[in-house]
Structures are given as structure tokens and as C-alpha cells.
Amino acid sequence: YNVGDTKEVDLGSFGTHTVRIANMSECTNGETSETACGFVVEFADIITKQEFNSTPTNVGGWRDSELRTYVNGTIYNSLPSDLQNVITTTKVISGHGKTSGETNFETQDKLYLLSGHEVYEDGTRYQISGYDTSYSNTKQLDYYKNQGVTADSYAETIKQDDYWWLRSAGSSTTGSFLMVDSSGGWFNFGARGSASFPFGVSP
């Protein structure tokens, strides 16, 4: 197996989707989140669209979000049983928003969205580390590192020319999570977006 290898997976009512090997390297710089350590698989496409929360808040971050419940319930349960059986529980560290007193969140998840740093390294012009408080707790996944993805250069992050959520709360607001846009760039967006326009889910 190699980083970047893909395979199609039948998710029942969600249809057929593509998973890819996103990482094989171990964490060696004291990363406390296990989300980019060792063998990591991600979806190379968008499974469905969903709001992060039904109200425009990032209080409680990924840990307390409605989307985390959905991903680890509805989406996980749609996976073939042979795939469910090989997915291990992962220690997930996620960034917080501007709410007073909040620190980074720790969860134990079967499935999780990627963080800002797991996709983007800081660029020279733009830095995502200023918006993702968990930046130093994880590292860039091998797939995106091999593609040279930074906050300045990001064409290889595009999934179906659409928007998809990251799990990092936008640190400068109380109502946004980071996202990847249709051109591959990143930005803050209100956690709810709008009722009629949810964004892509790609754990």
C-alpha cells in the first residue's frame, strides 16, 4: 500500500464513495492528537452535506457538535461491517473558538473530520495556525504534504469542486468552524451556514 492509493466503498443509502490512504508516517514531534499518526484513511470525496450545528455556535467545538454525533452514528453505521471491524478508536484533539475559558477539546472517535493543520501547513503569505488552536497538537497528513499543500497553495485539497468542513473551530469567533472551499482554500464560516445550504462531510 502507498499514500494516495484509493478504493471504492459502498455506503448503502449514501451511495458508493472513494477512500484513500492519507498517511502512513508516525508522529515524532510530540503530537498529542493521534489523528495524523500511523495508518490514516480519509474519504477522497464528499459523502453528504450537513450543518455543523443547528444554531450558529462553535461553543464546545467538535466535541459537542451535532455533526460529530452524526458522523460517528449515521455515517459510521453505513460503513460495511468488514470496514467497521478494522477502524480503531482514535484520540482526537480539536481546536476551540473565542469563548472565554475554552481550551482544546479531546474526544475518542471512530470517525473524525480533519483539522486545519492536517490539511494545510502554514504558508508564507497566509497562516492557518492563527485560526486553529490545535495546530501544534497534530501534523499535516502525508498525502497533503506530498502534494505540497500550504495555506498559500492548495489545489490538491479540492473535493468535487465543493465546500467541506474541517473539525477545527475558528479561534477568532464563537460561531464558525474552518472549512475548505470549492477552490481548495480555507476560511471561517458560521457553524450553521444556512438551513438550506449545509456543507460537505468528508471524514
Locate predicted features.
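Collagenous Gly-X-Y triple-helix signature in extracellular proteins
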Residues: 1-202
